[in-house]
Structure formats: C-alpha cells, structure tokens
C-alpha cells in the first residue's frame, strides 16, 4: 500500500492543506504490536481482519479474536475498506514454467521448486497457510522448498530478484513490482482478502475520521484500483 497511500496523501493536500499525514508501513502483525505498546497512531489499516479484531473493544469478550482484551479503536469507525487477491507470481521469464497453484502443489510435493512466502505472523503468510491446508500440504515437511519474508514486500523482492522460483503475494504487490501473475487464489482456497480500517482512540479522532472518509471517495478509490485493489463489498 506504500505507493497508493503516498499518492493519496498528496491528493489529500488539496482537500485539507493544513493536515500533515505521516505513514508507518510494516506488516499488520508488527503494526499491531507497535500500537498495542503505545506507538503514536491515529488510523490503522490492516491487511486482514485478524489484527484489527485484536484491538477492537467490541470483541473484548471473544478471547479468540481479541486475546489481550485491547480496546484501542473507535468501534463505530471500523469499515472494510478494500479487497485484494492472493496470487502466485513468478520472476521475469518464469524460468520454472509455473502456471498454477495446482501445479505448484505438485512441485512442492516433489521438492522441485523454491517458493517464497510470508511468515505465519503476517496476513499474507496466514493466507498461504490456508492455501497449503486446501491442498493438504504440510508446511513443516516442505521446509527445504520454502523461503520466508517478514512481510509481503520481502517476499515480493525475493521473487523479483529470482532468488525464488515463485512467491505467494498480493495482486497489488505483484502489480507494483511488475511481476507476472500466473494464478489467483479463490475464496474457497483462502477466503476473501479484506483490508479493514479504523480510527484509533486519541486526540486526533476527528482528523483521522476525515481522512478515512476521503479514502472511500472516488478519487482515492481510483488510485487503489489502479494497482489491483477493489472496494470491499
């Protein structure tokens, strides 16, 4: 989201010239940790509901969704902002000739591929775990065929540099990096990829809500859609 949100911040200057927007881009899991430890933040956009649920006070009685009992967001501000797709991307020239998730599953079983994936504590890694479960793949048994990234950007870089034969990344990251997407995971394989957003409790709730409202406008959505996002339904 680095590129899109940076562009949108520039556009927002025409709407609110006195508002200074500072971003902190990282994996959703790391951002959750930073916010829960007191990092200064007014608006949170997560790459999956899990990390948003973990700070949603309306779920404080649900220990599975909010295990630490955090109450950090303005609950009424929470929305499903964007939808992404989980894709199988390959380096330039696709040297391994990978064409689909079905084929990838067979290559993993034979140990004849190097796949880049996200760590289990970040959303892209969690979606990958669901894809493995769909194909009946044991991640631990595939250790010699897997290389990991701390976030989706690291996975994307491994594919771009051809240090892996392919990688499981978001459609938007593949688009931004100019990578070829050979297949997209279905909802049956890993569920929908929803990006929730919410204002955090604090002194700047009004300004944060105004920017969140702007993110839902046609102007902002056009930027998101240019790299493969769609508005969440």
Whereabouts are the PLM-identified features?
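Periplasmic-binding protein-like
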Residues: 42-46
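Exported/periplasmic ABC-transporter solute-binding proteins
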Residues: 1-16, 29, 33-36, 48-49, ...
């Amino acid at each position: 989201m680095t590129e899109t949100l940076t562009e949108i911040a520039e556009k927002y200057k025409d709407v609110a010239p006195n508002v200074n927007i500072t971003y902190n881009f990282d994996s959703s899991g790391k951002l959750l940790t930073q916010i829960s430890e007191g990092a200064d933040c007014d608006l949170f956009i997560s790459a999956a509901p899990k990390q948003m649920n973990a700070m949603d006070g309306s779920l404080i009685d649900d220990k599975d969704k909010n295990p630490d009992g955090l109450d950090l967001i303005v609950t009424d501000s929470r929305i499903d902002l964007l939808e992404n797709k989980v894709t199988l991307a390959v380096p330039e020239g696709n040297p391994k000739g990978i064409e689909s998730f079905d084929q990838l599953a067979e290559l993993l079983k034979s140990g004849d591929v190097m796949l880049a994936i996200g760590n289990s504590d970040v959303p892209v890694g969690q979606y990958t775990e669901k894809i493995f479960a769909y194909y009946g793949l044991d991640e631990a048994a595939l250790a010699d065929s897997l290389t990991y990234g701390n976030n989706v950007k690291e996975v994307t870089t491994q594919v771009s540099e051809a240090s892996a034969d392919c990688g499981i990344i978001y459609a938007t990251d593949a688009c931004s990096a100019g990578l070829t997407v050979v297949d997209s995971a279905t909802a049956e394989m890993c569920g929908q990829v929803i990006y929730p957003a919410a204002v955090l409790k604090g002194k700047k709730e009004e300004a944060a809500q105004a920017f969140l409202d702007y993110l839902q406008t046609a102007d902002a959505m056009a930027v998101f859609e240019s790299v493969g996002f769609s508005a969440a339904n």
